[in-house]
A protein has these predicted regions:
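Glycine-rich, hydrophobic membrane-spanning regions of integral membrane proteins that mediate transport
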Residues: 1-153, 186, 208-234, 241-480
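Alpha-helical recognition domains of nuclear gene-regulatory proteins
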Residues: 140, 173-177, 240
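Glycine-rich segments within core transmembrane alpha-helices of 12-TM secondary carriers
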Residues: 188-207
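Intracellular juxtamembrane helix-capping segments at the cytosolic ends
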Residues: 165-179
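Hydrophobic alpha-helical transmembrane segments of multi-pass membrane proteins
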Residues: 59, 155-162, 197
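Alpha-helical transmembrane segments and their membrane-interface exit regions
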Residues: 158-164, 235-243
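Short membrane-interface loop/juxtamembrane segments of multi-pass integral membrane proteins
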Residues: 175-190
């Protein structure tokens, strides 16, 4: 039988089914290629961590879209059940007031946190999701309190405005991390396309669930109102888990205070700079930062807090004709107990074990020093930066704090002697390490040209004539 002839049974020509199968596969392949081109950037134009970020973001947007649909449904129900259910105009006024007052949240975020966003994009992004989900929950339970529609709806709308504004603001710094070919606009466009698809999937799922439950609600109306409340829990968990995974996948190249402390701690311990993936894994996405819970948390603050008395300021300025780039102090803890840190620090003085029992030693059960059980024994470190302080100076100060955490207890010294020795020893070690540290940072791909600090940490001091200031302070001390 020749090609194209009918089969003896009068069916389709031989090979017709094969051709249909090939056409279907070809069409599916073209569709997949077009979808990939529309939704995803070129693999060679983004970093490897982009794909985990995109995958978890897609799932998170689906969950978030479902939550939004259920929240809106409940808000409309609340308007219908409240005092305004017979007055459409009053319902409209309530809705407009809710939106208008909610914009105050957006204004508050833009006015008060502008500088802080750059220094902590991950923490702000995760916090924005927590606030958004909490606000959505307030909307979902509003039908159960119809007489309080306006205050509940306004509070929820303010929270959602804060969450949305924060998420939009920090999106660009995160997306900039992925680009390899100056293609930020492409990555932003593809991310928006992915968001539209995910939002529509979530919308379809939520509407389908609502329609299914509406049939059941014809028998028991209370079930329809309870569905969003029941669905909120798993959807919120999915939303937060996905955003957590999404942000953990992001490997920022910039250095802020927390990342600098993590890198410095690992460098002091291992003499190597950790990879960006390792630092991303060690970062915390919710307040407080990891090292804020260490045995010597670092606070970057004003000179007045670091040197609260004229005598302490004189001691800090002595030995230099020009203002120091930074001044570091620490407040010892109030406990009388002492702990020896079991860390091998090069050139550190020999540990003194006199009068120290085995119970007071910290066993190396954890990977990092700041993961040990908090003892509250060493107090806190205080750092003030001068207006001439460079990023190198900031990094040196943070390395000095890392060495401070690693220094052994000296029972042979008085409290004042131990204070002076600890600052001098840690400063010497930091000066020794800073060149190697900055070189290895660059080799690892970190952007060490600028250390990102928030507005509260940017309170630089300026001293024009150090000798004259010291003389005036010493005279003031004598007079008192």
């Amino acid at each position: 039988m020749k090609p194209g002839e009918l089969t003896p049974e009068g069916g389709a020509p031989k090979g017709y089914g094969v051709r249909l199968d090939l056409m279907a596969r070809d069409a599916a392949k073209r569709f997949a290629e077009r979808a990939s081109h529309a939704l995803l950037p070129e693999p060679s134009s983004v970093t490897s961590d982009y794909w985990d970020y995109a995958r978890f973001r897609f799932a998170q947007r689906i969950a978030s879209s479902c939550i939004s649909v259920f929240a809106t449904q409940q808000m409309l129900t609340a308007v219908g059940l409240g005092a305004s259910r017979t007055l459409p105009a009053a319902a409209a006024v309530n809705w407009v007031l809710k939106d208008g007052l909610g914009r105050l949240g957006k204004l508050s975020v833009a006015a008060n946190f502008g500088r802080a966003f750059d220094s902590d994009v991950k923490r702000f992004r995760f916090t924005s999701s927590v606030i958004y989900d909490a606000s959505s929950f307030v909307e979902i339970i509003t039908p159960y309190f119809p007489k309080h529609f306006l205050p509940l709806a306004t509070a929820a709308n303010i929270g959602k405005s804060v969450g949305i504004t924060t998420a939009n603001v920090v999106r660009a710094p995160i997306q900039r991390t992925f680009i390899l070919e100056e293609n930020l606009a492409e990555v932003a466009a593809k991310t928006s396309a992915q968001q539209v698809v995910a939002d529509n999937i979530g919308l379809a799922l939520a509407v389908g669930a609502a329609r299914t439950m509406s049939k059941v609600a014809s028998v028991r109306p209370e079930i329809r109102r309870a569905l969003p409340v029941i669905a909120f829990g798993p959807l919120a968990v999915l939303d937060l888990v996905c955003i957590w995974k999404e942000l953990k996948a992001v490997q920022l190249r910039t250095i802020n205070k927390e990342r600098a402390e993590i890198i410095a701690e690992m460098f002091v311990k291992e003499r190597e700079i950790p990879t960006r993936a390792r630092v991303a894994d060690a970062e915390r996405l919710f307040i407080p930062a990891r090292l804020d819970k260490s045995n010597l948390p670092l606070t970057v603050t004003s000179l007045g807090e670091v040197c609260s008395t004229p005598k302490s300021l004189v001691n800090a300025l002595k030995g230099s004709r020009n203002a120091r780039p930074y001044i570091l102090a620490y407040e010892p803890g109030t406990s009388k107990q002492r702990v020896v840190l079991d860390i091998n620090t090069r050139d550190a003085p020999k540990r003194v074990a006199t009068n120290i029992t085995a119970k007071t030693r910290i066993k190396r059960k954890h990977k990092f020093p700041w993961q040990r059980k908090k003892t509250g024994l060493k107090g806190r470190a205080l750092l003030a930066l001068s207006e001439s302080a460079s990023s190198r100076d900031v990094l040196q100060a943070i390395i000095q704090v890392a060495h401070l955490r690693a220094l052994p207890y000296r029972p042979d010294l008085t409290a004042e002697q131990a204070y002076v020795w600890a600052l001098q020893e840690s400063e010497s070690l930091a000066k020794r390490d800073i060149d190697v540290f900055t070189k290895k940072l660059a080799d690892r791909g970190w952007n060490a040209g600028r250390v990102l600090l928030n507005s509260a940490e940017r309170a630089p001091y300026s001293v024009d004539n150090v000798p004259a200031l010291i003389a005036a302070l010493e005279a003031a001390v004598k007079n008192t």
